[in-house]
Amino acid sequence: MPKYKDINKVLVIGSGPIIIGQAAEFDYSGTQACKSLKEEGVQVVLVNNNPATIMTDTDIADIVYIENPTVSVVEKIIAKERPEGILATLGGQTGLNLAVKLKEEGILDKYNVKLLGTSFESIKTAEDRELFKRKMQEIGEPVAESVTVTNIEDALKFAKNYGYPLIIRPAYTLGGTGGGIAHNDEELISIVDLGLKKSMVGEVLVEKSLYGWKEIEFEVMRDAADNCITICSMENFDPVGVHTGDSIVVAPTQTLSDYEYQMLRSASIKIIKALKIEGGCNIQFALDPKSHKYYVIEVNPRVSRSSALASKATGYPIAKIAAKIAIGLRLDEIKNPVTGKTTAFFEPALDYVVTKIPRWPFDKFYTTDRKIGTQMKATGEVMAIERSFEASLLKAVRSLEIKAYGLRLNNVKAMKTEEILKGISVPNDMRLFYIAEALRRDIDIDYINEVTKIDKWFLNKLLNIVNMEREVEKSELSEGILKKAKRMGFSDREIATIKGIKEEDVRMLRKQHGIYPSYKMVDTCAAEFESVTQYIYSTYGEEDEVEIHDMPKVIVIGSGPIRIGQGIEFDYCSVKALWALREAGIKSIIINNNPETVSTDFDTGDRLYFEPITLEDVLNIYEKEKPLGVMVMFGGQTAINLTEGLVKNRVKILGTSYESIDISEDREKFSKLLRELNINQPKGDYALTVEDAKDIALKLGFPLLIRPSYVIGGQSMEKVNTLQEIIDYVSNATQVSPGRPILIDKYIDGREVEVDAVSDGECVLIPGIMEHIERAGVHSGDSFSIYPARNLSEREINTIIEYTERISKALNVKGLINIQFAVKEGTVYVLEVNPRASRTVPIMSKATGVPMVKLAVEVALGKKLKELGYKSGLWPQTPYTVVKAPVFSMEKLTDAEVSLGPEMKSTGEIMGIDLSYEGALYKALEGAGLKIPKKGKILLSIAERDFQEVPSLVEKLQSLGYEIYATYRTGKYLSLMGIHVNVISLDNAIKLLKDGYFDAVINTPTKGKKPDNTGFKLRRTAVEYRIPLFTSMDTIKAALNAVAKVNVNGLSILSINEYEEIQKDNVKNLVL
C-alpha cells in the first residue's frame, strides 16, 4: 500500500500538443503513470488538451478533461474534483511550469493539494539557472562560468570578461527554445533579447561555451527514503553544442574509461540527492576529452525525452516507477515488471548497444536553415538495438525512412570533396553521411576529429562500415562475406545496391546459405533472470532466444518516427488495434522503432519487435511468426507503402486489399474510378513530365493544385498560380514519388469537409462529418475542423453520405477509410481518399464515442458491423461541439515559411470541446496560441487577392473596439474604400512587433517562401515573438466571432466522461 494513506485521488497534468522539444514521449510516460497509479488503487484525474494521445482515452485515467492546461482551467478542475495530490513531473515543461504557477498563486495551498514526487523547492532549484548554479557550488559539483541575466547589458558585460563563444539558455523552457551559441556581440544581443521573451520568468543563463567536449547523460531514480540508482548512461555522438534532442545518442556510454564512468555516476547520485528529487531525473555533463575534467550542464527534474529513451533502451519502466515513488512507495517495495522476480531497486545491465537518431522536418521546409545547435529542431526519433555499435547505427539509419538503407547516399556521393568538407565543418542533419563519404575518400580520421570533435572511437566504427562496403563491392557474395556484412548490420537492399543487383536476389542468396536473423530479448538484466515480457530485437550470427507459439496471432505494422504529416495519431490507432486484437482472443504483435510511443511500451502488445519498418525486416518477422496476417491500415503511409512488396511475397493483408489501396493511392486509377461511379471530382489530368504539366495547365487555367501519389502530409503538394511555378514544382514533385503520376487539379475555392468511416464492404458507418474553417487548399492537417459540421445543407450531407458509401463499397473497404470533399455552390467534389486510419480517427472516436479502431479490427478479422451493433449511414451527431486546432513548431525552425497551404506544416493538434460552438472554438484558439484579447492593437498586411474581404473584416474589428494598423498597400486600399486606419511601413511594423506593441497580426502572403521578402520576415517575427498570427482570412473571421460571442466565465468545464454520458443518452433512442 502507498506510504501516503491520505492520497486517494491524484490530478495528472499532461504535456499538451506535440511540438518540437515535447513530443510523444510524454504520452508514453503519462499513460504509464496513470496505469501505475491505478494499480495502487488511486483514482486518476487527467487534464490534457491533446486528443491524439492514448492517455486522453477514458480507459487510461478514471476522469479525463480535454481542456487547456491553464491556471484558471486547472483551478476549476481542482475545485470540482478535489484531488489530494497533483503529479506534474510527467507532463514535460508544460506540466512543470503549470505546477510552479499553481503553487506561486496559492491555488495548491487553497485547496490543500500536495505536489507529489519532486517538491516545489526542488523544481525551482533545478529550473532556475542561478539557484541551480548555487546549489552545485554548495555541493562541490563544477559548473561552467556563467551569469544569469534579465537584460542585454549584463550579458554584454559578461562577454567582455570571458570572451566568445557563449551559450545562452533561457529558464523554464523546453527543447532549448530561445537559446543558442553567440560568437560576437551582435549574435549575443539577438539571442538574449529573444531568450528573455521566451523565458517564463524573463531570465537567461549566459555561460562559457564548452563546445567540443563530450556530452554524457545519466538517467537517475530516487525515492523518499533516499534510495538511489542510475538506470542508464548515454553518450551523445555529437559533442556539446548540439541539443541532445538533435544529437545521435548511444546507450550505454561507449568511449568512457571505467574511472570516468564511475566519476560521473557518483556525481549523478550526489546531485539527485542534493536536489531531493523523488522519481526520475536526467543529468547532463560535459566531459573534457583531454582530461578527467567535467562540468554539470543541466538537470531535468522530471521525466524527459531522455527518460523515454532510457526506458526503451533498458526495459526499465521509469515513468511507471516514478509514479509509484510519487505516492510514497520505495524502490525496494516495487516489483520489476519485466522480470517479475526482482524489485525496481536494481541497476539495469545491457548486453547490447542502443542508438537513437533524430528525425528532422527539413523535407517539409526547403528554405529552413539545416544547421543544428542548442535549439532543438527534430520532430521525432528512431531507436535501434543491436550487438555492436555499427549494426545498431545502420539499423537506426534505415528506420528513419529518408530513403537511406546504409551510409551511402547518391546526392552525397555526387558532391565535390570541398562540399563534403564544408558539410562536416558544421553540425547539420546530413553530417553522418558526409563523414562516411569523407572516409570513403580517405580523408584522415585525425582531421575529421579535429573539425567535428566527434570521438575517434565513433569515427573508427564508421570506417569499419566503409571498409565493409569496399569488401562487399570487391567480393563475389560468398557465404563468409554475407555473414560478415549481415553481422555488421548491412541490409539486403544496401548489399544489393553496392553489387548492382536486386534486393530479392540477396534475400534468396542469404537463405540459400542459411543466413537468418536470430532474435533476442530485452530483459533489463543481461539475461541473468528470465524475462516475462516479450520485448525483442534481431541480430545475426547468435543464438535465437525467442520461442514461437502455435496460437492465432496478427502483426500490426507501426508508423515509425514522428514527423510532420504522420504524428502520434497513428500510434494511437496502432495501440487501440493491439488492444482490440487481445480482446478478440488473438495474440498481438507490433513492429515499430519509435522510442517515444505507447506502442513500443513493453506490455502494450503481446509481443514487441523493436525493428526498422522495411520490407526485409517485416518479412523476416512474418516468416518466423507465421501469423494469420498483417494489418497495415494503422501505420500511416509507412505501412501502406510496404503493402505492394508484402503482397508480392505472399503475405496476407488483413483489411482492405492491396488492389484497392493501390487504386486510391494512384491518382490516375483513382480518377478513373470516380468517373465510373459518376462522382464529381475537380477537373484535372495527370502528368509524368514537365511538358505534360505545361499542356494541362494551359488547358485548365489557374489556380491549380498539384498532388503526387503515395506521399504523406501533402508532401510536395502545392497551389500554383503561374506557368513558371508549375515548371518549378513539377521538377521537385517528380522526385518525391518516382514512376507515379502527378495529378494536376483545377483548384476549387470551396469549403472542405472530411469524413472517417468504418466499412465491412457492405455496411458503411460514418461516425461524423467534420467541416474545415479554412477553404480547400489548406492541408486538412493544418485546418481548424469543426464537428458536427455547421454549414452543410441536408442535400449536401446526403450526397457526402452517398459518395462515402459508393466509394467504400467499390473499393471493398474492410476497415477504416478517410475521404476529403470540397463543397462549392451546392456541388460536392471528392478530393482524395485514404483507405486507412487517418489523423482524425482519435479525435472523432473521442468526439462521437464510436470505437472506430476496435470496429475496424473486428471487420478486418471477418465480422460484420451489424453483428457488432452498428448500421450503415451517419451516426447521430452530438449535442456539443468539438473543434480540432493545428499546433505549429515554427519558432524552432529558422527561415521556415509559416503561412498555410496544401503541404502540411503542423506538428500537433489540440481539441476544444464545449456545449456551445463559440466556446469550443474559443478553447481551440487559446490552446493553439491564437487567443486574441478582448481589446488591443491589430496589424493588417493583406495580399491583393484578398482585398475584397478586408473592408468587412476591418469594420468587424473596429466594432469590437480594436485599434487597427495596416501596412502601406493595405492602408491605401482601405483609404480608397473610405475606411481610416493607422498606416505604417513594413520595416516599422517588424520593429514594433519585436517590442510587443501588437496583440495580433493578420497577414496573407503574396509570394511566400523567400526568406528575404519583407512579408516573410513579418510572419517570422510574429512567430518568434509569440504574437498570434493569422495567415488565412477564414481563421481570423471565425476567431473574431468566437471572441465576440463567448463569455469566458460561462465556458463549460466537463470531463470527457460527462460528454460521453450526454452522447449515450442522445444515441439511446437509436433503433439499430
UniProtKB/Swiss-Prot annotation:
Region (Carboxyphosphate synthetic domain): 1-401
Domain ATP-grasp residue range list: 133-327, 671-861
Pathway: Amino-acid biosynthesis; L-arginine biosynthesis; carbamoyl phosphate from bicarbonate: step 1/1; Pyrimidine metabolism; UMP biosynthesis via de novo pathway; (S)-dihydroorotate from bicarbonate: step 1/3
Reaction equations catalysed: hydrogencarbonate + L-glutamine + 2 ATP + H2O = carbamoyl phosphate + L-glutamate + 2 ADP + phosphate + 2 H(+)
Binding site for ATP 1: 129, 169, 175-176, 208, 210, 215, 241-243, 284, 298
Binding site for Mg(2+) 3: 820, 832
Molecular functions (GO terms): ATP binding; carbamoyl-phosphate synthase (ammonia) activity; carbamoyl-phosphate synthase (glutamine-hydrolyzing) activity; metal ion binding
Record InterPro entries: ATP-grasp, ATP_grasp_subdomain_1, CarbamoylP_synth_lsu, CarbamoylP_synth_lsu_oligo, CarbamoylP_synth_lsu_oligo_sf, CbamoylP_synth_lsu-like_ATP-bd, CbamoylP_synth_lsu_CPSase_dom, MGS-like_dom
Binding site for Mg(2+) 1: 284, 298
Alphabetical list of SMART domains matching this protein: CPSase_L_D3 (SM01096), MGS (SM00851)
Enzyme Commission number(s): 6.3.4.16, 6.3.5.5
Binding site for Mn(2+) 3: 820, 832
Ranges for region Oligomerization domain: 402-544
Region (Allosteric domain): 930-1072
Binding locations of ATP 2: 707, 746, 748, 752, 777-780, 820, 832
Positions bound to Mn(2+) 4: 832, 834
UniProt domain MGS-like: residue ranges: 930-1072
Region (Carbamoyl phosphate synthetic domain): 545-929
Amino acids binding Mg(2+) 4: 832, 834
Residues where Mg(2+) 2 binds: 298, 300
Binding site for Mn(2+) 2: 298, 300
Chain sites annotated for binding Mn(2+) 1: 284, 298
SUBUNIT field: Composed of two chains; the small (or glutamine) chain promotes the hydrolysis of glutamine to ammonia, which is used by the large (or ammonia) chain to synthesize carbamoyl phosphate. Tetramer of heterodimers (alpha,beta)4.
Family (UniProt): Belongs to the CarB family.
Family matches, as PANTHER family: CARBAMOYL-PHOSPHATE SYNTHASE [AMMONIA], MITOCHONDRIAL, CARBAMOYLTRANSFERASE FAMILY MEMBER
Record protein name field: Carbamoyl phosphate synthase large chain
Organism in which the protein naturally occurs: Thermoanaerobacter pseudethanolicus (strain ATCC 33223 / 39E)
Taxonomic lineage: Bacteria, Bacillati, Bacillota, Clostridia, Thermoanaerobacterales
Record gene name: carB
